[in-house]
């Protein structure tokens, strides 16, 4: 932010800064820096006196102040060079001026009347097209006459309605600002004076018309809509705004509110931010993949096919219309669009069904029905199937019945097999030494696993094995009443827990 102030050193500048910050909209740090710079120069400030001040702020940055006869110009530079390069864009700065009475000596005055005016100022030296702001405040002021001429240019605009005798009043030594103190005091005219009872205090009195500062600032500078910043109070900070790109706009368009500019800039920023997300979305376009290898759409041909999922589960391979993604039949449809007439019910098991399946034994019996007996406490199986796996009976079947059961499971549309059992899903048909069938899967094109590939299958022996294994499923101990114990043996043994170590005919 660029601030230009003109004031005399005879005023208690620290108290002036606090009062100025209270009634206007400057930040405390910058006003305190002005007060420090003014209080260090105890000599009277004339236009021919100028100095270049440099100091470090609390944030670690550097501030440079240009002091020309009470005309203080200061800017704050950032700490790092990278941040400084970012801020080198063309910007509009706020010019704030305070006018004292030039006809009196600054050291002899205890009361200083001034006015604050705001206007945009450009870094290139170009100022607002108003008559009041046609002078660059950075020009070198050689003497007091040039400084008074600078004030005269500002005074023309203020008393434009009565400005017929402006030059004559200046030649006669009349006070440029004090002349308006009694006759036609304009809005925003303030007076600072010392309170002799309290030397450290400064009194502020409004001598102008009781009009809001917001309306006065609007009338003085129409090319910058800063009056909207005063809605929340006078303690707002005026920040630099980026220069408008269109230089040939009319004065009416320049008087638009800053809120509209913020809305347009926010909309442009949102549009620029949403563009990468749209590009990412277009790159990650989902491709339909079917279970059959023939229906898989190749990535190279995805742009030349419609790709809409049909009712039978396949994808539409029709060439889309030129300039579109879909064909004429599926115009405007999504990839996973399903017609509302077809409703696929979702078969989700209820809580009751889940509880029933959890509280049963679950062993698959030879007739392919699950055992629904309640398991023993703290176990998964019932008393009859203790220690058995779910598919234990499946391995006790002969190969023909086993193949038949597998084919029946494949023919059922409701069951979904996760593994491809065509060719490689058959188990080995060989029998192990303990009489049980081999549980290894046979490779494709053979009926034996790698261990039993040289052995031949004896169907007679398999039937004997079946009868033997069927008799080995139960304990088989003959009870006193002539019946046979049908309890399942302990894992790794031939007898149950009750008849452990007993013979059949004992």
Curated annotation (Swiss-Prot):
Keyword Cytoplasm listed: yes
UniProt keyword annotations, A-Z: Cytoplasm, DNA-binding, Nucleus, Repeat, Transcription, Transcription regulation
The UniProt record lists the keyword Transcription: yes
Top-level taxon of the source organism: Eukaryota
Sequence ranges of the Cx9Cx9RCx2HK repeats: 306-331, 361-386, 428-453, 475-500
GO CC terms of this entry: cytoplasm; nucleus
Record's compositionally biased regions (Basic and acidic residues): 248-272, 404-413
GO biological process assignments: regulation of DNA-templated transcription
Polar residues bias locations: 234-247, 414-423
Disulfide topology: none
Record text about domains: Contains a bacterial GIY-YIG-like domain.
Protein's recorded name: Protein EFFECTOR OF TRANSCRIPTION 1
Organism ancestry: Eukaryota, Viridiplantae, Streptophyta, Embryophyta, Tracheophyta
